[in-house]
């Protein structure tokens, strides 16, 4: 049994180390003054995807990110850890997109990719803390969603079911859902594995697919 997994990932400014130049006069983040990193909870999500790849031979893990050209850096980071490929959704038309526009763009890109069992991403990005994009993507695709996930326990593709442990107030619960499905992962999930030196060498000249706004029009 093999799975097709799409990991939603975002490059974000590192708001954990905020200096005096981190904010603009209008109260927005000065992204140029902060280092860009792989959103932490998206790394937790990537680890869950890679564990499924380890468990189910033939499984592929594909990263999907939206942003300017430099956002391709997180595709490289994913490849260095064991992902198989990536799509960069980039266009001036996406500049300043809110969560509604972002989720629409991601959902239309996913429809174009059109080969997935699991769509997984972090619960929220540290530059917005909205936790809206994952659920909105699920809604736009008409898929079931499981949020606040800590661990994927089992996948039965023949039965079309997945079992997930998720965090709730005061404890955890185990839930099942149908495939395909959208899952968002908490920061309390297992941290992502480090880079693999052999993969770093392999993907020095990384190849990934650019998608523009007109290519995802539905």
Predicted regions located by residue number:
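Glycine-rich phosphate-binding loop signature in dinucleotide/nucleotide-binding domains
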Residues: 110-116
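A glycine-rich helix N-cap at a beta->alpha junction
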Residues: 74-100
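Anionic-ligand binding region
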Residues: 161-172
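N-terminal beta-strand-loop-alpha-helix module at the start
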Residues: 2-66
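Short Gly/Thr/Asp-enriched flexible loops that form oxyanion-binding sites at enzyme active sites
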Residues: 128-141
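Short, acidic/small-residue loops that bind anionic groups at enzyme active sites
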Residues: 139-158
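A charged, well-structured terminal subsegment
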Residues: 176-204
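Conserved small/polar residues in nucleotide/adenosyl-binding loops
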Residues: 209-216
